[in-house]
């Protein structure tokens, strides 16, 4: 039977994403859901900027399987709702963004902030509290530089917090840099990668393929209470 513990590591442009990690400041070990490259067509060439790995808490499999077991990878990768269920599901997510090309913290944080604020204002949900959180988000990045191989690490928790950490040596640090208590930002960070307009289609494809396999081999009995739990969380 396939289980999260049987998830394998992945190599993306010589960036190795291990099969499991323990996020900074956390006691839980999360499994590798999927990984892929983020890039863009520039003057006819596909330029690769980062490799992205998305890790999930073990209980994500029974929770998602209650609704998505039996779907093919192709069906999942084309489902906005499936990725939305990952983003909003009541389990931890850990996103590792590792540089292929160098990037400054200021460049990265300003791009993410502009995207978040734009979406929130368009939906009429932007508040003063959100503005204060964005200021803190920009502050923690402003003096950082990320050479190739350096990583930005995000932990999205079901309680609505976003934990941010940095790694310059390829290792996952034990302590986090900052914890921001803002559910919208916590979800927006991972949604920017795997959501409807996510920046890494390759990561979405990897997630869909690996999770389809894990769910389809998961013990049916273990999913009995999963869908009601998802429903309680608005999924």
From Swiss-Prot:
One example of a Gene Ontology biological process annotation: flavonoid biosynthetic process
Pfam families per the UniProt record, alphabetical: Chalcone
Pathway: Secondary metabolite biosynthesis; flavonoid biosynthesis
Record-marked site positions (Important for catalytic activity): 108
E.C. code: 5.5.1.6
Binding site for substrate: 50, 192
Catalytic activity: a chalcone = a flavanone
Keywords from the UniProt entry: Flavonoid biosynthesis, Isomerase
InterPro entries, A to Z: CFI, Chalcone_isomerase, Chalcone_isomerase_3-sand, Chalcone_isomerase_bundle_sf, Chalcone_isomerase_sf
Annotated GO MF terms: chalcone isomerase activity
Function: Catalyzes the intramolecular cyclization of bicyclic chalcones into tricyclic (S)-flavanones. Responsible for the isomerization of 4,2',4',6'-tetrahydroxychalcone (also termed chalcone) into naringenin.
PANTHER family, per the entry: CHALCONE--FLAVANONE ISOMERASE 1-RELATED (PTHR28039:SF8), CHALCONE--FLAVONONE ISOMERASE 1-RELATED (PTHR28039)
Further comment found in the protein's record: Part of the biosynthetic pathway for all classes of flavonoids, a large class of secondary plant metabolites, many of which are brightly colored.
Family to which this protein belongs: Belongs to the chalcone isomerase family.
Protein name in UniProt: Chalcone--flavanone isomerase 1
Organism: Chrysanthemum morifolium
The encoding gene: CHI1
């Amino acid at each position: 039977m396939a289980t999260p513990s049987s998830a394998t590591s992945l190599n993306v442009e010589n960036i190795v994403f291990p099969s499991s990690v323990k996020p900074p400041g956390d006691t839980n070990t999360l499994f590798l859901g999927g990984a892929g490259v983020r890039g863009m067509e520039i003057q006819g060439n596909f330029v690769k900027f980062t490799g992205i790995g998305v890790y999930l808490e073990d209980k994500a499999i029974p929770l998602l399987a209650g609704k998505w077991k039996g779907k093919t990878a192709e069906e999942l990768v084309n489902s906005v709702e499936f990725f939305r269920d990952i983003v909003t599901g009541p389990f931890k997510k850990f996103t590792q963004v590792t540089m292929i090309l160098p990037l400054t913290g200021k460049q990265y944080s300003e791009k993410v902030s502009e995207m978040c604020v734009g979406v929130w204002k368009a939906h009429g949900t932007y508040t003063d509290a959100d503005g204060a959180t964005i200021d803190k988000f920009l502050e923690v990045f402003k003096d950082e530089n990320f050479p190739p191989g350096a990583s930005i690490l995000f932990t999205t928790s079901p309680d609505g917090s976003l934990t941010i950490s940095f790694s310059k040596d390829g290792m996952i640090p034990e302590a986090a840099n900052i914890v921001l208590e803002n559910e919208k930002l916590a979800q927006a960070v991972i949604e920017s990668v795997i959501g409807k307009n996510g920046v890494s289609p390759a990561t979405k494809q990897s997630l869909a393929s690996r999770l389809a396999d894990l769910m389809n081999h998961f013990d049916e009995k273990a999913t009995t209470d999963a869908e009601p739990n998802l429903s309680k969380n608005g999924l």
